Amino acid sequence: MIKHFINLDDLPNHDLTQIIKQAIALKKQYKSGKINKILEHKTLAMIFDKSSTRTRVSFEAGMTQLGGHALFLSDKDIQLGRGEPIIDSAIVISSMVDVIMMRISSHKDIHTFAENSSVPIINALSDESHPCQLLSDMMTYQEHNGSIANKTIAWIGDGNNMCHTYMQAAKSFNFKLNIATPKNYQPDQDFIEKYANHIHLFTDAQKACQKVDLVVTDVWASMGQEAEQTKRKITFKDFSVNAALMSKAKPSAVFMHCLPAHRGEEVSTNVIDGSQSLVWLEAENRLHVQKALLLYLLN
């Protein structure tokens, strides 16, 4: 049976934990200068309809480090961007490569692609979730503070795809999640109902951050929402992660952001560049955790 990675909780906790464990080992191996060509002669197709820095660089570099090859396919490069049916593209592309990574707008389209693919599909970001980023976040927390189980995390800002994936992670990794959003910017109702036992909803960021172990945020306007930027700056002004907000968390608390960040909006400069911030380690770990994910999916 083909294994896909479309949502974080597609995989059992044991498998997610093993992927992170292997990622830490691969990172140590890479830092020591050891060469591992375990994916030699394997090809990863990377399909994008969104611009990307961390996703493209981490997957492409990761395949190279493991001896494989990564093929970049934007919607301008392939017939999928000119109206070829998703089913047809899935059948053809999967017949020529070993694994496919997709960073596209429609989560539904990723599912359709997976249903018609003969190789594993990785969701590298959709309008619904961002599971690869969460693997990196969980790895980063474990490296810095140990197990995240039974900890309390505060999500501050928009109830977007990253927030959805943190809700999935709360169940998979057994932590409590406080979600603070403006009134009309909560996560999708389906997610609220599905993960109700693992989350608490707030409209006050300071209350959500009380005594938490980790504070996480994301941009106020995601790609495709640029027209709402000015309105959202006003609506979200009380949901900026600054030093005053971080002071509500535990003294040992850390800060994460999937990047890119807008300093002075969702996070202040002194927080993202401060001693509690793990954003650079978090970004670097995308490389190693995705290498471990590729090895898992390719067995």
Swiss-Prot record:
<feature type="binding site">
    <location>
        <begin position="52"/>
        <end position="55"/>
    </location>
    <ligand>
        <name>carbamoyl phosphate</name>
    </ligand>
</feature>
<protein>
    <recommendedName>
        <fullName>Ornithine carbamoyltransferase</fullName>
        <ecNumber>2.1.3.3</ecNumber>
    </recommendedName>
</protein>
<dbReference type="GO" id="GO:0042450">
    <property type="term" value="P:arginine biosynthetic process via ornithine"/>
</dbReference>
<keyword id="KW-0028">Amino-acid biosynthesis</keyword>
<dbReference type="InterPro" id="IPR006132">
    <property type="entry name" value="Asp/Orn_carbamoyltranf_P-bd"/>
</dbReference>
<feature type="binding site">
    <location>
        <position position="218"/>
    </location>
    <ligand>
        <name>L-ornithine</name>
    </ligand>
</feature>
<dbReference type="GO" id="GO:0016597">
    <property type="term" value="F:amino acid binding"/>
</dbReference>
<dbReference type="GO" id="GO:0005737">
    <property type="term" value="C:cytoplasm"/>
</dbReference>
<dbReference type="InterPro" id="IPR006131">
    <property type="entry name" value="Asp_carbamoyltransf_Asp/Orn-bd"/>
</dbReference>
<keyword id="KW-0055">Arginine biosynthesis</keyword>
<feature type="binding site">
    <location>
        <position position="79"/>
    </location>
    <ligand>
        <name>carbamoyl phosphate</name>
    </ligand>
</feature>
<comment type="similarity">
    <text>Belongs to the aspartate/ornithine carbamoyltransferase superfamily. OTCase family.</text>
</comment>
<dbReference type="InterPro" id="IPR002292">
    <property type="entry name" value="Orn/put_carbamltrans"/>
</dbReference>
<comment type="function">
    <text>Reversibly catalyzes the transfer of the carbamoyl group from carbamoyl phosphate (CP) to the N(epsilon) atom of ornithine (ORN) to produce L-citrulline.</text>
</comment>
<dbReference type="InterPro" id="IPR006130">
    <property type="entry name" value="Asp/Orn_carbamoylTrfase"/>
</dbReference>
<comment type="pathway">
    <text>Amino-acid biosynthesis; L-arginine biosynthesis; L-arginine from L-ornithine and carbamoyl phosphate: step 1/3.</text>
</comment>
<dbReference type="GO" id="GO:0019240">
    <property type="term" value="P:citrulline biosynthetic process"/>
</dbReference>
<dbReference type="Pfam" id="PF02729">
    <property type="entry name" value="OTCace_N"/>
</dbReference>
<dbReference type="Pfam" id="PF00185">
    <property type="entry name" value="OTCace"/>
</dbReference>
<feature type="binding site">
    <location>
        <begin position="222"/>
        <end position="223"/>
    </location>
    <ligand>
        <name>L-ornithine</name>
    </ligand>
</feature>
<keyword id="KW-0808">Transferase</keyword>
<dbReference type="InterPro" id="IPR024904">
    <property type="entry name" value="OTCase_ArgI"/>
</dbReference>
<dbReference type="GO" id="GO:0004585">
    <property type="term" value="F:ornithine carbamoyltransferase activity"/>
</dbReference>
<feature type="binding site">
    <location>
        <position position="161"/>
    </location>
    <ligand>
        <name>L-ornithine</name>
    </ligand>
</feature>
<feature type="binding site">
    <location>
        <begin position="258"/>
        <end position="259"/>
    </location>
    <ligand>
        <name>carbamoyl phosphate</name>
    </ligand>
</feature>
<feature type="binding site">
    <location>
        <position position="286"/>
    </location>
    <ligand>
        <name>carbamoyl phosphate</name>
    </ligand>
</feature>
<feature type="binding site">
    <location>
        <begin position="130"/>
        <end position="133"/>
    </location>
    <ligand>
        <name>carbamoyl phosphate</name>
    </ligand>
</feature>
<dbReference type="GO" id="GO:0006526">
    <property type="term" value="P:L-arginine biosynthetic process"/>
</dbReference>
<keyword id="KW-0963">Cytoplasm</keyword>
<feature type="binding site">
    <location>
        <position position="103"/>
    </location>
    <ligand>
        <name>carbamoyl phosphate</name>
    </ligand>
</feature>
<dbReference type="InterPro" id="IPR036901">
    <property type="entry name" value="Asp/Orn_carbamoylTrfase_sf"/>
</dbReference>
